[in-house]
């Protein structure tokens, strides 16, 4: 049974001053109502709470059987009957119909208007005749594009809205019959059309398909009947033949109820064929279709009900558009709308069904009516249903489904929305005598009432005969009495904000007794406001701000309700409070702190919200009183979370004595841990008790302390207003235990508790350095990263950081601001990325007796990195410019880099010029294997040439030449050796080497 709330969604009402009893009526956009009676259509102006006034009237060809209005194109379309023939006509430019006798132009669909006649069509109403080969039964206009769908027996005809461009200033509305949808064995009672989605309904069947453009699966489209299951088709034909045979014996064959969703609906047995009738084949709008839903109902034979009690009614497709898809000035609404979600509603007399049909097809809600319904109309906020004497208002879940389509963050810790599956309810059952028809537009409900004498059946028929397919209606005999009275009412629905406030007031009756009932009603209020915000085209100026405020307030109310829950839904406290815009202090101020039976109980919802809020760095600091209450709350509900809570920046103002007392209680209660120890050490530091701090820090090994910091990073690092802020404990460790601090931050990075850039910023802020200055502690951290070989660290980026810093210090002769934690020897022994420094490098460095010892470590680390196996030498060359080759340090680095790039000849030239004593060690280390020829091709000629020139380095060159000749004499044959010797040399100098080379072969 649907829950009923006695609310007041309906406001004032007025009577429409029409002269004849309406046959049909419908809304006309934002400000008009059309009423068809006899052979005339009257248009009434409807604006807000003002009285309904006649606007214009125009004659029709005959009695109006169906009437529909399209906001896109601003036209009215009608099915009219005259002399037992039906006609389809569209009334365009009706707003220019000033008097009933004003001239009207009539033209056929697709008729080109000549220039001289265009002025007449611009300034007066004109009618478009749309001939059909079969009688039209029902019509529907696309609310987005303005296309017209017409239902006929076994087929649907689609007329596309288009415009004939007469000149630059004027275009004429027209239609083109673009598509025929053949559907075998169905007589449509109602159709609905929206942006390619087609819904068709017979007495007991509903079919929904989606028309699609472009070749299916990239293939050329051939128009032929859509293949259906042959077995099902044969079964259907067999049943049809059996029915014809058996009905003569008073047997009734009823098909089973059936629901097919998605691709399965192809098995419905209905043959669907598309026939394109557009003029231009390349501009074909729809070329194939997709089955979405098929549902078939069957009468309950055991109930012996009349046939009218088993007929479907009120088929409707309801679109919901993207929020903010309309232009700010409200113009070109139909062109600017972007479909977000689409819903389909249809109803039996006692049950209504609401489906979602866009991305997935699923049944959202089932409506059980307390009495037989006659008609229903669906809006984004409500479902309005009329029975013979009641107007019923039910809630819907359209906005809940659309919100999830629109926002990917829905149903997360950031945002929430009441579930689509939540039970619907009735807000109001309003008494109206003799209700016959209903329609809805904007914030108005139009009702037709007629008090008729009681209908008397002509004769009593057997239940079997009433269910016969040949006799689907009951003949009613009406006594020849005077026509009963009738009225056409406009019922104004109250504003969403006003109804929302009433629902909130109503929910207070359940607040302390039935939390779930309170949540249900507040959820309905929330969805009401959300739906109103989605339907931006219906909002009055200034109403949106009021709705947004109501939306936030409703989120706060829902947060309050869920905070009192201790169930699986208590986690919804967090997103609702977030959406409410309430601060944590404001939420705590709304909390009931009363104590019952001497025990304070805190529900899981509130604990969940506070816990997450304290973790999310909200830049909100609680005052001392609220902070103490929060600690007390967690000590009672979740004592293990107390250390984490105390580390939150929001708890900055808590009294350290209060914090320490709760931490000591944890020790005595058996909750002692490394995290409790570190938190006590941090609190002791705030209290200024250094002895207690030292004792706590000494109670565990350094490895355990690192594990504790990994469990709670906020002991070291906090964020305030988006900026990283080191804690007081981190500042203290920088001075007393920098190694522990670096190891802890490295552990945080290794466990994904802090990013690379965040860690760099932390050390810069910790050491009070600006963005361009690199403290030694950060260099220590980079070196520790290399040693640890973290998988997520980009090696070359880390190499670049370190080498840049080493080079900068060497070029500026800038010593580290603190003592490095590791020496170059430590790094070489601990890390494979730091290589052994080449022996000849030591010779180069030792040649400078005036070398500055303050930066020897930086030079050694840089040389070691360059000598390592992982370093990309080419990437560092552009950054070597500040390190001049004029210094021995710069010389060693430049020669090292060129050596790694295999520029050996250039390196030999540099060393011969700058440091000849290092040439032989260099050659011994580098000139091997394929480079061994450089001994006699490069080094030997260069030394001979420099010896000829003499100078201060003569003796160094001479000793180097002797070493070189010794190596060459071993490597070359005598003939080759003689060829590489200089022609003008002293024979006595080279003779020993020649003799050694000549004896080398016999000796071996």
Curated annotation (Swiss-Prot):
> Could you say which tissues express the protein in this record?
Widely expressed. Higher levels of expression are observed in kidney, liver and placenta.
Is Cytoplasm found in the keyword set?
yes
What is the official name of this protein in its record? BLOC-2 complex member HPS3
Disease link: Hermansky-Pudlak syndrome 3: A form of Hermansky-Pudlak syndrome, a genetically heterogeneous autosomal recessive disorder characterized by oculocutaneous albinism, bleeding due to platelet storage pool deficiency, and lysosomal storage defects. This syndrome results from defects of diverse cytoplasmic organelles including melanosomes, platelet dense granules and lysosomes. Ceroid storage in the lungs is associated with pulmonary fibrosis, a common cause of premature death in individuals with HPS.
- Organism (species): Homo sapiens
Where is this protein chiefly located? cytoplasm
**Assembly, per entry:** Component of the biogenesis of lysosome-related organelles complex-2 (or BLOC2) composed of HPS3, HPS5 and HPS6. Interacts with HPS5. Interacts with HPS6.
One GO cellular component term of this record is:
cytoplasm
Q: What does this protein do?
A: Involved in early stages of melanosome biogenesis and maturation.
InterPro entries linked: HPS3 (IPR017216), HPS3_C (IPR029438), HPS3_N (IPR029437)
Keywords linked to the UniProt accession: Albinism, Cytoplasm, Disease variant, Hermansky-Pudlak syndrome
Q: Where is this motif: Clathrin-binding?
A: 172-176
Q: Name one GO biological process term.
A: melanosome assembly
Localization, UniProt? Cytoplasm; Cytoplasm, Cytosol
